[in-house]
């Protein structure tokens, strides 16, 4: 391995002898973007292969008993993979990236270039109610960190490549390059200079281009706003109300996640954690099938105005046309999603909080719209409130209003909702910040055993 590294380094020096440092960083940003795009593609292929093979044959008009079993299998497989093959903690991907930047000279173990893909896809494919973004971000960051290590870059440039990898991976999964850049600047807090932003832009654009080449041009959460979904001035009070509700849901999201994590930490046996987590998750998914996996199908149904699809594979399928049942189902699913997510991670699954925050936000926005339409006979767009709610809860949970605004703007193929996005995201951020000034990532950083030993 040492000889191989020396050979790579000599070839790198020979090829870049006539290039300046900034040119070298731009070249390496392209390399990181390509690798991050490929890693994201492999993750999605593995995830959708597992998920499709397990549940595509389920009848839509009834619940299936395998919903009780699949999540526990996924968690135990991920736990065994981590314990006996990886032998390192690969959960809480974004938190680990922040920790590596602050305390490990931006060094991330090489195995994270692939282990997060396997662990995350296994957990989510079998029904773990977590998001793929954290494993993907950790994978991209690991690629950037290890490219920097192989090139023998200093701490500053290695950190820049780490951030390029993280942003590129996020840009690739959503096909949203601006979101990848803003995510790094806002959450990873990379210094804003021309020397740092340009490689970051290059990596994000390269990874997004790879995603277009491998998966087509449609975003993972593609939605096109119709004329009836357009923002109107009379809706401003409703978006203010939505911002307050999203702020409260953000606080519920973070506090419940921490409480569930503390509960599982008191369980002394990993076997018992798996048993409890698998049982809780299986029961919740059996009753509320939209909780299965990352939940993209759930809020895609809401974004396309087809709330009845949430009842597919459900015990309540025959009630899907009753308005008040739909509203209660959406609200209950919204609250139980947080418990399902926290139980998955705490029991040993590998996944993140990014997609769950979008899920909870989508269901929060849809709940407000459905309630307004049902009780006041208003013609409120469920689609626009679903999208804006996603930005609201994400803004509060991650303390990242800009990332949430640009993500939803890119996903909706335009900026027609920019004003309500700004209103709701900022109010949600303010409400949640008043209740808890820390983001979910810094909260997890504070509560990790490793960080407590550093204090």
Report the location of each language-model feature:
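Alpha-helical transmembrane segments and immediately membrane-proximal extracytoplasmic
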Residues: 1-448, 455
